[in-house]
Amino acid sequence: MKIAIAGASGRMGRMLIETVLNTDGVTLAGALDVPGAAALGQDAGLFLGRETGIKISSDIEAVLSAADCLIDFTRPEGTLAHLAVAKRLGKKMVIGTTGFDAAGKQALADAAKSIGVVFAANMSVGVNATFKLLEVAAKLLSTGYDIEIIEAHHRHKVDAPSGTALAMGEVVAKAIGRDLDECAVYAREGHTGPRDAKSIGFATVRGGDIVGDHTVMFAGIGERIEISHKSSSRQSYADGAVRAARFLADKPSGMFDMQDVLGLK
């Protein structure tokens, strides 16, 4: 499979490029970045000290024309622009971008009617195993336990709560028959009164170079259960994304997530 990488000069983009170059069965076909990026025109493997013959470009049409699939961990507005071109050219996409609003998510769903799309807030195998653990725990602890989700990321992350934290909330809410949109609490300040027993709380930490920490707490009387996942490197995200791209090889269309990719459904 021929893979192109969006956000090629960013931290995640570089990790994805390195992973594609080191993975059998896939080839690097393109490297995309925004107009004006300092890396435009450079070889995509320059940061590795390795010539690839692929120049970083801002021409989405040219980049996608040479590829079978685009892996995109950028920002919602950029991803949606790339998606429109991918849909028109019939190219698949693996999307790890977070922070989409309802209209953005609908655009992804609409595109998936004609191209294969893997969309997941977190591509890590470990995080997706954690989702399954949370589903089991939530069903067992649905009564008498308060549910709180705490997440921490580096100072540069622009959306909050993280997409992974929200996905964890969705898993828990679905398991206990609640609607996250109705029961989520994202901020507490001042005199808040007693905690609503049916709420799912979120707390966000931003600082330093934290790659990604997530903990779901089930707090009861006399005991507390915590299920945590801590990332020390973006490598797990990159490995999962490339695995997702390979999964799409025989999928002409459809919306998938990492649970599909990993066979956990």
From Swiss-Prot:
NAD(+) binds at residues 7-12, 33, 96-98, 120-123. It catalyses: (S)-2,3,4,5-tetrahydrodipicolinate + NAD(+) + H2O = (2S,4S)-4-hydroxy-2,3,4,5-tetrahydrodipicolinate + NADH + H(+); (S)-2,3,4,5-tetrahydrodipicolinate + NADP(+) + H2O = (2S,4S)-4-hydroxy-2,3,4,5-tetrahydrodipicolinate + NADPH + H(+). It is found in: Cytoplasm. Pathway: Amino-acid biosynthesis; L-lysine biosynthesis via DAP pathway; (S)-tetrahydrodipicolinate from L-aspartate: step 4/4. GO terms for molecular function: 4-hydroxy-tetrahydrodipicolinate reductase; NAD binding; NADP binding; oxidoreductase activity, acting on CH or CH2 groups, NAD or NADP as acceptor. The active site is at 153 (proton donor/acceptor), 157 (proton donor). Its EC number is 1.17.1.8. It holds the Pfam family DapB_N. InterPro entries: DapB_C (IPR022663), DapB_N (IPR000846), DapB_N_CS (IPR022664), DHDPR_bac (IPR023940), NAD(P)-bd_dom_sf (IPR036291). (S)-2,3,4,5-tetrahydrodipicolinate binds at residues 154, 163-164. One of its GO terms (biological process) is lysine biosynthetic process via diaminopimelate. It comes from the Bacteria. Keywords: Amino-acid biosynthesis, Cytoplasm, Diaminopimelate biosynthesis, Lysine biosynthesis, NAD, NADP, Oxidoreductase. The keyword Secreted does not apply. It is an enzyme of class 1 (oxidoreductase). One of its GO terms (cellular component) is cytosol. Its main location: cytoplasm. HAMAP family: DapB. Catalyzes the conversion of 4-hydroxy-tetrahydrodipicolinate (HTPA) to tetrahydrodipicolinate. Belongs to the DapB family. This is 4-hydroxy-tetrahydrodipicolinate reductase. It comes from Cupriavidus metallidurans (strain ATCC 43123 / DSM 2839 / NBRC 102507 / CH34). The lineage of its organism: Bacteria, Pseudomonadati, Pseudomonadota, Betaproteobacteria, Burkholderiales.
